[in-house]
C-alpha cells in the first residue's frame, strides 16, 4: 500500500513537471497564462514568473494584461526580488491608474524600496527613495488600510537617516576634523530637531568646538573660544542633567580660564 502511494506521488510529480516544460515550449499564450496563474496560487512563484515573463509582451493592450502584470510583479515580490518587484509595480501603477489593485500595487512598490534599504552605515539612496514613495502613497491614500504599517516603515527609515547623519558628524569628531564635525552637527540639529541623538549631537558639537578653539593659532583662538562657549550654553540649557554634563563643565571651565587672558589684555 505504501509503495503504491509513492509510485502515485512520483507519477503526479512527473506529470506536473512534464506539463510545465510543455507549457514553456508552447506557443499557446492562454495555456501559459492558465498554468502560470495556477502555479502562482500554489505559491510556486518562480515557475509562474517564468511563464508570465514569456507572455507579457503578447498580452500588451489586451484586457488580461492588467491581471497578468500584477501577478508577475507580486510573484517577484513574494520571491523577495525587490528591485524587480519595485520596477514592475511602478509600471503597473503607471499603466493602470484606475485599477482596483492600484492601492496595493503602490504600497508594495514603496515597500519593495523599503526592503532594499541597507543598514545605516551604507549609502542611503534606496532609503531616501523608499521614504519618497511611502510619502507619496500616504498623500494619495491618507486613509489606507496600509497606513499604520506605512507610518511604522517611515519612522524606521527616518531613524536610519538620523543614524547615518549622526555617525558622519561623530566620525569627523573622532578623526579630529573639528570644523567638518561642527558643520555636520549643525546640519543634523536643523534637519532632525526631535532626534533621539540630539543630546549627543549638542554635546559633541560643543566638544568639537572646544577642541578646535584650544588647538587654534593664537589670532583665531578668542573667537573660537567664544563660539564654543555659546555651544556649551545651548547644550546645558537643553540637557542640564545629561550624562555628559561633568565633561562639558570641565571644558567650559577651561574655556573661561583661557578667555580671562583676553579680558585682561582689553
Language-model segment annotations:
Residues 2-8:
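Sec-dependent signal peptide recognition
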Residues 5, 13-266:
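Acidic, polar-rich low-complexity tracts and alpha-helical solenoid repeat scaffolds
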Amino acid at each position: 500500500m505504501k509503495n503504491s502511494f509513492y509510485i502515485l506521488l512520483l507519477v503526479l510529480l512527473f506529470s506536473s513537471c512534464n506539463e510545465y516544460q510543455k507549457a514553456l515550449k508552447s506557443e499557446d499564450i492562454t495555456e501559459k497564462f492558465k498554468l502560470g496563474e495556477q502555479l502562482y496560487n500554489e505559491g510556486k512563484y518562480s515557475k509562474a514568473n517564468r511563464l508570465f515573463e514569456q507572455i507579457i509582451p503578447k498580452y500588451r493592450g489586451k484586457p488580461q494584461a492588467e491581471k497578468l502584470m500584477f501577478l508577475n510583479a507580486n510573484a517577484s515580490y513574494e520571491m523577495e526580488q525587490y528591485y524587480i518587484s519595485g520596477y514592475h509595480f511602478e509600471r503597473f501603477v503607471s499603466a493602470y491608474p484606475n485599477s482596483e489593485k492600484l492601492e496595493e500595487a503602490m504600497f508594495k512598490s514603496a515597500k519593495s524600496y523599503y526592503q532594499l534599504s541597507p543598514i545605516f552605515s551604507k549609502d542611503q539612496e534606496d532609503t531616501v527613495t523608499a521614504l519618497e514613495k511611502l510619502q507619496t502613497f500616504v498623500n494619495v491614500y491618507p486613509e489606507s488600510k496600509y497606513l499604520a504599517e506605512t507610518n511604522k516603515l517611515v519612522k524606521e527609515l527616518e531613524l536610519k537617516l538620523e543614524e547615518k547623519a549622526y555617525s558622519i558628524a561623530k566620525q569627523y569628531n573622532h578623526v579630529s576634523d573639528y570644523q567638518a564635525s561642527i558643520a555636520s552637527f549643525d546640519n543634523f540639529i536643523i534637519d532632525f530637531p526631535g532626534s533621539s541623538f540630539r543630546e549627543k549631537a549638542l554635546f559633541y558639537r560643543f566638544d568639537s568646538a572646544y577642541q578646535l578653539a584650544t588647538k587654534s593659532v593664537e589670532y583665531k583662538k578668542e573667537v573660537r573660544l567664544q563660539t564654543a562657549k555659546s555651544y556649551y550654553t545651548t547644550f546645558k540649557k537643553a540637557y542640564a542633567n545629561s550624562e555628559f554634563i561633568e565633561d562639558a563643565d570641565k571644558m567650559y571651565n577651561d574655556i573661561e580660564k583661557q578667555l580671562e587672558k583676553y579680558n585682561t589684555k582689553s
